[in-house]
Regions:
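Q-loop/switch helix immediately C-terminal to the Walker
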Residues: 25, 31-44
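Catalytic Walker B motif of ABC-type/P-loop ATPase nucleotide-binding domains
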Residues: 94-98
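Helix N-cap at the start of a conserved alpha-helix in ABC-type nucleotide-binding domains
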Residues: 105-106
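Conserved ABC ATPase "signature" region
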Residues: 39, 50-65
């Protein structure tokens, strides 16, 4: 359930549609192709007419996989599809759980550049990672948690 200042907002579709989420191992429908999965999600977006999936496939270099079943993809390609799913509707808020998991160096650099551009536009980015170096350029604040407790807060 989603809360904002003690208020349940789960029913507020406008707020929910403004959040892009990627989890460590993206989960989509295994029996659907990449294009079927993302086209379905695209239809649910308020700005679906502005989403060009072919541009995202090109950005991530996965044009050749768009008609491949999600279950047949490598972990790195699944991660790219998960990132498209999180980014394609240009959300105001991003929650990224280990977004660079299984990605090659070139893709990591492209995603880092994209995230810096989105941050400059005012996108709120919440990073969940074990690799501190991968987030330092994006963060105004880093909160380190160990065993469920905050152990350190670093602010720029």
């Amino acid at each position: 359930m989603l809360y904002k200042i003690g208020q349940i907002i789960r029913e507020n579709n406008n707020y929910i549609k403004n959040v892009g989420i990627i989890i460590e191992n993206p989960i989509l429908v295994n029996e659907y192709t990449v294009n079927e999965n993302l086209s379905y999600l695209k239809k649910m977006s308020k700005n679906s007419n502005d989403i060009n999936l072919d541009e995202w496939y090109k950005f991530f270099g996965i044009e050749e996989y768009k008609n491949t079943l999600f279950s047949k993809l490598s972990l790195g390609t699944k991660q790219k599809v998960g990132l498209i799913q999180a980014f394609m509707h240009k959300p105001h808020n991003l929650i990224l759980d280990e977004p660079f998991n299984a990605l090659d160096k070139g893709t990591v650099e492209k995603v880092q550049k994209y995230l810096l551009e989105e941050k400059e536009k005012g996108t709120l980015i919440v990073f969940i990672t074990h690799i501190n170096d991968s987030i330092l350029n994006y963060c105004d604040e880093v909160i380190e948690i160990e065993n469920g407790k905050i152990i350190k807060i670093n602010k720029k």
